[in-house]
A protein has these predicted regions:
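Conserved nucleotide-sensing/catalytic segment adjacent to the nucleotide-binding pocket
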Residues: 49-89, 111-112
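A glycine- and Lys/Arg-enriched "phosphate-lid" helix/loop adjacent to the NTP-binding pocket
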Residues: 100-175
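Hydrophobic anchor at the beta1->P-loop junction of P-loop NTPases
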Residues: 8
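Hydrophobic positions on the alpha1 helix immediately C-terminal to the Walker A/P-loop
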Residues: 19
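Conserved substrate/cofactor phosphate-moiety recognition/catalytic segment
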Residues: 25-67, 102
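P-loop (Walker A) phosphate-binding loop of NTP-binding proteins
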Residues: 11
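NTP-dependent small-molecule kinase module
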Residues: 151-247
């Protein structure tokens, strides 16, 4: 089976996890690759501080170490899931390309990583793209949100590893996401300034945007299965995606 990889992108606090949980419920024949945050949190020093905390507390010291770890653990999780899954659609909570075009690039250009570290990091990414899985073939869903709103959401969820995140950092991430994805022909941009967690209509609108993008990208419609939104239960107002072979 030729699996379609769709990566959910966006700033910290934009709502990627919520968006992915909605997709999991409403999208047939799909599997999810979560961001390897638990792996990062489990990697601790003698003071029981994990690498994520250490990175946010001292970005200059830990930038290369953390980006190298992020690169390797993303590769591991993506390839493990693709190899074990029988699903046609694989949704990623961020991709390897996110680090290359946003996080690592920003750290390097802000002088948090030196040139040698930058080149060493990109050796991994370039090898993966060339010999394993080319990220240019992905579809990207860019969840775009005002950095101030992202910061409020981060404070609300109260993760200890994120206590050091400030508005300037989120504004920089927003800029790099924009430069990478706003004019990317493989990307769909979705405005997430308003909460969509409990808005069924907005959720279905977002899913239809993804469906339309996949239809445009697909060259062989004879082998492509269209996805439609269909009301399954009128009383409960629940909707699901069903598949039917395109003509």
């Amino acid at each position: 089976m030729n699996k379609k990889i769709i990566s959910i992108e966006g700033n910290i606090g934009v709502g990627k996890s919520t968006f992915i949980s909605i997709l999991k419920k409403k999208w047939p024949n799909c599997d999810i690759v979560s961001e390897p945050v638990e792996l990062w949190k489990d990697l601790t020093n003698d003071d029981n501080k994990n690498i994520l905390q250490m990175f946010y507390e001292d970005i200059n010291r830990w930038s290369y170490t953390f980006q190298n770890l992020a690169c390797i653990t993303r590769m591991m999780k993506i390839e493990d899931k693709i190899n074990e899954s029988n699903c046609e659609y694989i949704f990623l909570d961020r991709s390897l390309a996110t680090d290359k075009h946003v996080f690592e690039k920003m750290l390097f250009e802000n002088n948090n990583m030196n040139l040698i570290e930058h080149k060493m990091y990109n050796l991994w990414c370039d090898f993966y793209d060339k010999y394993v899985r080319n990220s240019k073939n992905y579809t990207y869903i860019y969840l775009k949100c005002d950095p101030n709103i992202c910061l409020n959401r981060i404070k609300k969820r109260g993760r200890s590893e994120e206590e050091s995140i400030n508005l300037k950092y989120l504004e920089d991430l927003n800029k790099y996401h924009d430069e990478w994805l706003l004019n990317n022909e493989n990307a769909i941009v979705i405005d997430c300034n308003e909460s969509f967690e409990d808005d069924e209509n907005k959720q279905l609108e977002f899913i239809n945007l993804i469906i339309n993008k996949l239809l445009v990208q697909n060259d062989n419609l004879d082998e492509f299965y269209k996805l439609k939104i269909n009301k399954e239960n009128e009383n409960d107002n629940q909707k699901k995606i069903i598949k039917e072979k395109s003509l």
